[in-house]
């Protein structure tokens, strides 16, 4: 059975040290819209951190749209992901992309992460 499709606080990266650890020792994946840095964790599930800058995403409306899209994709696919900390950074092309393009791009990145570290099976 799939777990609940929520995004509780324990599934979020918040501390600067968590972001720094991911950037220093994590594996990078990317495409035209996003860069993902992933590092295994001992938390028992994936955690998400966002880095959506004014430089790459423009106005607050666009930044928040991109953030919502990332969080929603993570929420829907978190039970298929391995136990890793993920830092997702938006690239400049994400600003003008349609929501469907962003969702497809994120799905491809989640699959790359899962190929690197297979998700534990939920029997």
Predicted regions and their residues:
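Positively charged, solvent-exposed patches that mediate nucleic-acid binding
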Residues: 1-123
């Amino acid at each position: 059975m799939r777990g609940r499709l929520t995004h509780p606080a324990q599934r979020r990266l918040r501390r600067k040290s968590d972001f720094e650890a991911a950037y220093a020792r994590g594996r990078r994946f990317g495409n035209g819209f996003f860069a993902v840095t992933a590092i295994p964790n001992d938390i028992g599930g994936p955690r998400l951190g966002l880095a959506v800058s004014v430089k790459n995403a423009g106005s607050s409306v666009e930044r928040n749209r991109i953030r919502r899209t990332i969080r929603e994709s993570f929420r829907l696919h978190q039970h298929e992901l391995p136990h890793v900390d993920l830092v997702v950074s938006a690239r400049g092309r994400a600003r003008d992309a349609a929501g469907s393009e962003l969702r497809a791009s994120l799905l491809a990145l989640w699959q790359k992460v899962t190929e690197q570290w297979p998700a534990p099976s939920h029997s």
